[in-house]
A protein has these predicted regions:
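Cyclophilin-like peptidyl-prolyl cis-trans isomerases
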Residues: 1-169
Length: 169
């Protein structure tokens, strides 16, 4: 069996978060995330919404929670049993199920009410201390960090496996 892809998020300050992606759990979501990474979509993008004890949300090129890649992806069409525990990566979306694009979140703490509702697709393997540090920054009333928490680069190691472009709505 092939090794799962590993994502490396290098923050502007040099801190690193590594996460394993789960294509067997959320194939289209993983395909989309890898495609965006390969197009340098996340480089220079901030975590625009940070809620200590809940999650860090990023992936919006506009930096305000309204932006995306210009398309939306289809859901995975099957049950996703990955629980929203600390360190899990999941796709942000509107209230419409097939509305995810590029925004994702990293769980700071467990949030079982999200299980089965959002497409969880990976988990932090290194750098939970970095997630904790970002989760503790001072934010404004809209949960936006007062100091930008910028992803300098986001890269992925696919171990030679080719992942297709995502299915879009």
């Amino acid at each position: 069996m092939a090794q799962n892809p590993i994502v490396t998020i290098t923050m502007e300050n040099g801190d690193v978060i590594k996460a394993e992606l789960y294509p067997e759990i959320a194939p289209n979501t993983v395909n989309n995330f890898i495609s965006l990474i390969n197009h340098n979509f996340y480089d220079g993008v901030i975590f625009h919404r940070v809620i200590k004890g809940f999650m860090l949300q990023g992936g919006d090129p506009d930096g305000n929670g309204t932006g995306g890649p210009g398309y939306e992806i289809t859901g995975n069409g099957f049950k996703n049993d990955l629980k929203h525990t600390a360190g899990v990566l999941s796709m942000a979306r509107t209230m419409i199920p097939d509305s995810a694009g590029s925004q994702f979140f990293i769980m700071h703490k467990d949030a079982p009410h999200l299980d089965g509702e959002y497409a969880a697709f990976g988990k932090v393997t290194e750098g939970m201390d970095v997630v904790d540090k970002i989760a503790c920054v001072t934010t404004d009333y809209m949960d936006r960090p007062l100091e930008d928490q910028k992803m300098k680069t986001v890269t992925v190691e696919t171990f030679g496996v080719e992942y297709p472009e995502p299915e879009t709505v």
